[in-house]
Every structure is written in structure tokens, then in C-alpha cells.
UniProtKB/Swiss-Prot annotation:
Assembly and oligomerization: Interacts with ATG35.
Species in which this protein is naturally found: Komagataella phaffii (strain GS115 / ATCC 20864)
Residue ranges of the region described as Disordered: 44-72
Role: Required for the autophagic degradation of peroxisomes called pexophagy, but not essential for general autophagy. Involved in resistance to elevated pH.
Family: Belongs to the ATG28 family.
Top-rank taxon: Eukaryota
Name this polypeptide is given: Autophagy-related protein 28
Description of what induces expression: Expression is induced by methanol and glucose.
One biological process term in Gene Ontology: protein transport
Amino acid sequence: MICLFGNCNCQTGIFGLYDYVSFLYHSPSSCRVRLVLSLPASPNHMEEQSPKFESSFPRRTSEGPVDDVGKSPPASFYRELLANKAQQPQLSEDEEDHNPKDFLFKEDSEDELLIPDSENHNSSSTSPRKFKVENIRWGSDTLNGSILPLNSQGSNLQSLLSNVGELEHLLSKDVAKHSKYLKEQSSKVEKARANIVTNLTRLSLVLSSIFNTYQAKAQDKQAILDKIEEWEDEKKSLLDDMKEVLSTDDNADGETHKFLELASESINVENEIEALETRLKQLKIKQRTLKNECFQSQGIIESRLSNFVQAVEKIEMRERKSIEQVVQQLSENQLGYWNDNLALEVMNGLTINPGDISLVEEYEPVDILKQVESLEKPTIAADYHLPKNTNKQASRFTRQLLEFNYKCQPKLNVYPVVGLITKELKEDSAKEQEYKHRYDQVTHTLSALKDSFALIYHTEQQLQSITQSTQDLKDFQSLMNQMVESLLKTHSEADQYNLYLAKDVLAQEISIIHQALNKLNQSTEYSSVESDNVKNHDGLLFQTFSKAQERTKLPSIKSATSIRYAPSLYNSLSPTSTSKTTAKGEVNYDAGINKYTKVKEVLRSGKGNKDE
């Protein structure tokens, strides 16, 4: 951590917002500042640049660029950064905080960023290009989508699910570090913020991939069910046409009835031949004639049935292929109760054996929402019985009737498989909704934190510009109060939508900013209006920390603002050269405040110059 005007060696140990209070006791010509965040140049734009954080949490883009401040690093920079981090051995927390490859900053390099060689076409392959930290734009939408999630390319569903746990673990560590660095007033807080945004972006991409995977699975299964239902309806229509061909009703064409009557008469004639040998010759001639007519009728029936049979076979072939794909997929995934034996049993159960055919039954199309145990089969001549005979002719005609029935019988029983597919569809739909909700939560949290960090960054840039144009602390208080109000509004909406991570991070940020406001109020004699505003913020912050403390065990607002927990905050509001240390180790700020009062009087009287 360095001083606001970094070239000096005062070692105030401050960062962020508190750097801007140090200008009261240092000359800008002798110091420089290391900035982490920025805000647009004019305080009048605070409302325009405040985070637009509503129920859908849309991403906010800047009204216009302010020089090069806020420019996002190229996407390849983050990809190489993640690749380098994945190849590194596991480090302890302290080693990880000081590992230059773990974050954008290079230690002791005047706040410069390391950019991969592929982005610098004018540099050598071994020397990285330097990228100034002021060129980071927290509010830029280019950050979203430029960071690749772990194992997101070519990975299966299990690897994506494992990445969710890994990213959530990394995110919890980043939030803990963010809280720790804020309390310690460490310059690594910007690194923690960037890690939070990076991991949130990666998590949102992984959850989006999981959501898309389950959505695709559900759509595939739904498409199969829709096709099966369509094919079953078409099959029902064809079977109805078959039934009409075989019908013996008066409104039918009479071929089936004719066939049955001819067969019966042939049998009766044969009986007459046995009883009346005197009429044997005439009856045999008649019998041959009836047989020929019966065979002709049989040929007509078979010809009419052939097209329908082929159409049904094509439909059932498509059904079988679709069902085989589903069963194979379920078996390969080893989900739930699925195994190879069950898959084989399901496929064998699809085929209807000829021995299962009866003469009197009806077929109905499949109902997707209801699974039945047995398949009803279409038949002919439900109310017609052939005459009994002791010779072979009766059995031959009976077999012919069964053959007709078998041709009109569907050969594929899809009821059990439809029930299984419907069950899998419900499970995939439930997973789809679950991960869509988690994806929305992470996306909203990411949007809220990116906008809040951008607001803090732009505010600090605005405060820096104030140090070069005014010595009035009212400008500081007004600008910081506006920033606190915007952050409190974002925190309130995060609480409304149960974005716990965003609430905790914003509570830490608001607490640190609030400590600076308290110190400004203690060091000046301005109106009570500003103090009232700070008190109002204090009350809301106190409630916020009371809720957050139950889950995260954060220190209370009183302990967070005491000199024991934030000594670097008070050091940041007064230069080391003008402060005095008491016997107990506390800092006396009266000397610095008196010096500021004298300088202020000289400037107002016009007797001194700016150097004085």
C-alpha cells in the first residue's frame, strides 16, 4: 500500500477512497496516487451514471468514454491468465496473494498489467506488453463473455456440474479475501473485486451451459414424444381403414362377408358330399367353383391390405429407431435404475408375437399421459363363427382369418417406453428450471457488483480531479454521500431479490466508505446537514451489518469503525509528517488539522500564493 501521491515515502498505508483525503497535507507536486476505481468527471452526472439495477438487473454501459479510463483488456488476456493459473501448483493464501500470475497486477511495477504476447504485435515473443491499471473499465460489457469457464469447451454434463462447485468455492474464497482486504485497507482489494467479477462471469457461463444442456435434452425427448403421438394417430387412421376392409357391416363393400359366406358354404357342401354320394359329382364341381371364388376374394383382400400394412411397418420402424436411441442414451448415462439388462428387456418387449393375437379385440392409439399394461389388437369378424368340420378345410380357413388379423395387428408396443420417456422428460424439465433460476441469480449478482465497482472507480477518479481544483471538503462529502446513496439503493434491491453475495460485498464496501465520511465530519466544522445524512447512512448500514453478521460473522459497525480495527483509515486522513503518536500508540491529528486551517486562512485572505 502506498500514499495518495505515490512518489513520496510517507507510507500512510491507504488505498481507494481514503487516498483523496491525504491531499490536505501533501503537495500534489511531490506525490502521486495509485487508483483502483474511477467515476465520470462531473459530480452532476452521478444520477445519470448511477447503477440501473432493477428486477432484471440489465448491464449498464457508459454514456461515453473518458479518455482511455475504463477500457477493458482483450479477451485473450483473460484466457491466458486462466490457463497459467490452472497450470500453477496450489499455493497458500499468503503465497496466492503475492503470486503475480494470479491477478492482473505485477508487484512493484508501478501498477502495470501483463498482457499476453499474442496481443502485442510489436513486441518480442518473450517480453509481455505493459498495460496501465487506469485502462481497466469495470462497467464495460466486454468483460462479459471474454472469460472462459473451466472445462466449458467439449465437456460433458458431469464436468459442467463439477465446475459449478469449483467456481462457487473460488467465489466464496474471493468474497472472504475481499472482506479481509477491506478491513486491512490493503491495495489488494481491487484484485479481490476483479476475481469476484471474473468468477461470477465464469459461473454464469457454466450455469448457462448446464441450463442449455438440460433444455436440449428436454426438447429432444419432447420431440420424440410428439413424433410418436403423431405416428400413433396416423397408425390409428390406417388401422381404421383396415377394419373397414374387413368389416361385415351392411354399409361395407361386402368382400369380407362374401369370403366368410363362401367358406361356410364350401364347408356345408363338403358335408353334403359325404351325406349325398349320389350328388357327389355335382357337389364337387360346385365346390371347386366356390373355392376358386374364395381364393379370388382372398387375393382382393390381401391386395387391399398390402398398402396399409407397408405404411404401418414404416411407421413402426421409425418408432423403433427413436425408442432405440432413447434406450441407448439412458443405458449409456447409467441414470437411476437403467442398466443393460433392463434396456434389452425393454427392446424385446416392443415386439408383439403372433401367438398373442386373438380374433376379438380393438386397437386404440397411444395416450402420452397414460401408460397401459396391455395392448388392444384389431380383429375381424367379431360376431361371425365358421362352421365346424372334421376335415382340413375348416382349419385352413381359420388360419387364413388369423393371418388377416396378424397383418392388421401393430407389431410394436410403445406404451412402456412412452411412460419411461415421459418420466425422464419431467426430470429434465425440473433440472432445466433449477439451473435457469441459479443462472439468473448469478447473472443479476454479477450485474449488480460490476455496476457498483464501476461506480466506486468513477467516484475515485472524480475525487482525484477535485484535488487539483479545490481545497473544500464539502465537494468530497457531497460526492461520497451520493455514491453511498447509490450503493445503498443497489444493496436494498439485492436484498429484495435475495442476492446474498452481492449484499455482503456491498455491505463491506459501504462500511469502508462510511468510515471515511465519519472522519471527514470529525475533522471539519461544516453544517449539520451532512452529518445528518451520514447518520442516516449509519442507521441503514447498522441494520445491514446486523443481518449480514448472522450469516457471515462480520464485525459490527462499531467495531469496524473503531481505531483498533481500522488504523490505516485514520492514517489516510492525515500525513505522517504532521501527526503525533501518543504513549498508547494512538495518532494525534490536531497538528495536521491546524496546519490545514492556517493554509485555508492564507488562501482566503489572498496574502499567500499557491506554493505557500
